[in-house]
Amino acid sequence: PLQTLVEIENEILLSQKIIMDNLGIKPDLFAYPYGEASSAVQGIIKKYFKAAFGQHSGAFSFNDPYYIARFPINENYGSLERIKSSSTVLSFKHSSIMPNDPFMKIPQKRFVLDFQENPSSINCYFSDFQGSILGTKTTMNTKLLYELDRMPVPGRLRVNCTKIDQGTFWYGYQYYLN
């Protein structure tokens, strides 16, 4: 999100032209570089793609088709046990987070998550480049309010929420703090 919107759109158009010229296809899926997205960039992506993937872990869900979570499988996270474990994770039927823009110009310590169900058995974890961030959890009807103990540092801020109930449910979200 550090490029201008015009630069991002031009890069997408150029990339699509190169792919079309060399492979004869037009991609309809997008992966945000390093998972770094913003609401403004998502608006551009919606013009050219059917769905987009972030770089945050979580169960596959179409709750937000332009910021889909995924589990990376690579040399660091590619053991057979991890693949088996990741493939059985379930998504929450409904999930939303506030603030809802993955690009955060001003860091903040307060987050509201809504799963549209009783959240008493849901736990959320926050982490940035300095490690885990502890906080206070307050339950309000179907919502969880988290007040973090410290301000997140610039870079990536990850949110992971889980619930164990006839399977493991997982919600993930990634912010990029400028």
Predicted segments, located by residue:
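C-terminal active-site subregion of NodB/CE4 polysaccharide deacetylases
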Residues: 2-177
